[in-house]
Regions:
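Short, glycine/proline-biased beta-turn/loop segments that scaffold the active-site neighborhood
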Residues: 2-13, 99
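Short, surface-exposed loop or secondary-structure junction motifs
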Residues: 13-139
């Protein structure tokens, strides 16, 4: 199905024919954003959705593959929310993890934090550098 069937505002700048299967297979051409993205933006689903709505694909959908965890995860999350009315975390928990008795989470509530391994940030000069992705490097 076309993404714009569930997300009408998405149907602009060459994205009218992007299918959900393109997103799921990382071949949508949306492996990042041209607009600047700050770390705190990733936690604002409405801002991320608006960035996707304005973004032009970096390649013709279905012709190449490109992966960027933060962009693809948020894109899938917005589609799931538009279809199911649930966040990606709630959808996964209710529809997959709980029925299959899987201890796997997308997002955690505070009660689960003691179970999480400590993560140490890599040394880098600018935290926003993680969002730098050049389309020419994806060829």
């Amino acid at each position: 199905s076309p993404v714009c069937k569930y997300w009408p505002e998405f149907a602009q700048k060459g994205k009218e024919n992007i299918l959900v299967s393109h997103v799921m297979s990382h071949s949508s051409g949306l492996a990042g954003w041209d607009d600047p993205v700050k770390v705190e933006d990733i936690h604002d689903p409405d801002k991320i959705a608006a960035l996707f709505e304005r973004q032009e694909p970096w390649w013709e959908p279905g012709t190449a593959v490109g992966y960027h965890a933060l962009s693809v995860g948020n894109l899938m999350g917005e589609i799931i929310k538009r279809i199911s009315g649930k966040s990606i975390g709630n959808f996964f928990r209710e529809e997959i993890a709980e029925p299959l008795n899987i201890d796997f989470h997308i997002g955690l509530d505070d009660s689960q934090h003691p179970r999480v391994a400590e993560i140490h940030q890599a040394v880098q000069s600018n935290p926003e550098d993680i969002f730098e992705l050049e389309p020419k490097n994806l060829q």
